[in-house]
């Protein structure tokens, strides 16, 4: 596992475990419409069971637990929200998981900035 970016350099061991290794990590696709409090997050590379390297975004909500995805759309949109918050001197507090259907008819997931 290789950490690409994370919400803070001061994440605890428990937060890093919850974000990256916990068997209780939930899928974004199982939480469509959910409002997440962004207590911590990590973007990292991991290897799947077939040996393929995947980029995974994991968001920790201290109430709901960690929710992760390898969706490029969700990850891109979340990281754009993070960058916009940094540019404005703000911190992202909440995002909503949202879904849509692509032109090809496939379901995709993204996130919406709430506050």
Residue ranges and their predicted role:
Residues 29-31, 76-96:
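Short nucleic-acid-contacting surface segments enriched for D/E, G, S/T with interspersed K/R
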Residues 18, 45, 75, 79, ...:
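Compositionally biased, intrinsically disordered low-complexity regions enriched in proline and serine
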Residues 1-64, 104, 113-115:
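OB-fold ssDNA-binding interfaces and closely related basic DNA-contact patches used
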Residues 88, 96-115:
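Short, charged beta-turn/beta-strand-edge "cap" motif at the junction between a beta-strand
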Residues 63-78, 82-83:
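Disulfide-stabilized netrin-like
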């Amino acid at each position: 596992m290789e950490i690409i970016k994370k919400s803070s350099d001061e994440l605890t061991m428990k937060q890093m475990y919850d974000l990256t290794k916990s068997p209780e990590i939930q899928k974004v696709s199982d939480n469509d419409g959910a409002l997440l409090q962004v207590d911590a997050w990590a973007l990292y590379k991991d290897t799947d069971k077939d040996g393929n390297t995947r980029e995974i975004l994991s968001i920790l909500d201290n109430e709901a637990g960690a929710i992760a995805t390898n969706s490029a759309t969700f990850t891109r949109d979340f990281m754009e929200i993070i960058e916009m918050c940094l540019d404005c001197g703000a911190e992202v507090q909440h995002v909503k998981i949202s879904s849509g259907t692509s032109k090809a008819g496939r379901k995709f997931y993204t996130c919406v900035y709430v506050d």
